[in-house]
């Protein structure tokens, strides 16, 4: 027996049906698809196709709208901060850039620190929001919480100020800007 002489056993391979090759073959003309219509055609039907009837997604009314650039608030627990510091992913002074570097937030995201778990080491944490319990636990362990007003992307766009100062600069409302402009004119 050689590799060149190997053959499948008799009856192991069955030739496929040749469809649409004349009426004498038994599966010619309509090729086993019945008579004409949508199901006789190639391709597929979408699951929401209702045979030409007005589909459900068009019968129901529309309301509301989707916010084009929604603000995403990512969360991280106090216990997780402790783990990240122990593993060496974060240092004792935790900034938004360090959160971004390990993939917790993106450039446009906001960050909220939640109070699940315990903290034993003194950490300086910078974030947009802190829950009451998180703030309490961090400060109880001898740490510090720094509230930031801007995202990383917004701070990078502010060319006049240093990056850290830009993050900490409170946003001025449109009304306040108008009032300031009026004062300058007067």
Swiss-Prot record:
Sorted UniProt keywords: Ribonucleoprotein, Ribosomal protein, RNA-binding, rRNA-binding
Keyword Thylakoid: no
A biological process from GO: translation
Entry GO MF terms: rRNA binding; structural constituent of ribosome
Keyword Nucleus: no
Ranges of Gly residues composition bias in the record: 21-31
A cellular component term, taken from the record's GO annotations: cytosolic large ribosomal subunit
Segments of this protein annotated with the region Disordered: 1-51
Main function: Binds to the 23S rRNA.
Family stated for the protein in its record: Belongs to the universal ribosomal protein uL15 family.
PANTHER family, sorted: 50S RIBOSOMAL PROTEIN L15, LARGE RIBOSOMAL SUBUNIT PROTEIN UL15M
Subunit-level organization: Part of the 50S ribosomal subunit.
Full protein name: Large ribosomal subunit protein uL15
Organism (species): Chloroherpeton thalassium (strain ATCC 35110 / GB-78)
């Amino acid at each position: 027996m050689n590799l060149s002489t190997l053959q499948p056993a008799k009856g192991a391979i069955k030739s496929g049906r040749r469809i649409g090759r004349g009426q004498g073959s038994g599966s010619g003309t309509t090729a086993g698809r019945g008579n004409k219509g949508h199901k006789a055609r190639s391709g597929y039907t979408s699951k929401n196709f209702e045979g030409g009837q007005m589909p459900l997604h068009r019968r129901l009314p529309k309301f509301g709208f989707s916010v084009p650039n929604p603000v995403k608030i990512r969360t991280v627990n106090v216990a997780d901060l402790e783990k990240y510091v122990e593993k060496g992913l974060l240092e004792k002074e935790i900034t938004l850039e360090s959160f971004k570097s390990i993939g917790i937030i993106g450039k446009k995201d906001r960050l909220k620190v939640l109070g699940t778990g315990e903290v034993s080491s003194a950490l300086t944490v910078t974030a947009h929001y802190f829950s009451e319990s998180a703030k309490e636990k961090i400060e109880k362990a001898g740490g510090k919480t720094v509230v930031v007003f801007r995202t990383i992307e917004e701070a990078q766009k502010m060319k006049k100020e240093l990056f850290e100062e830009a993050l900490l600069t409170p946003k001025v409302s449109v009304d306040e800007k108008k009032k300031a402009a009026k004062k300058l004119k007067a």
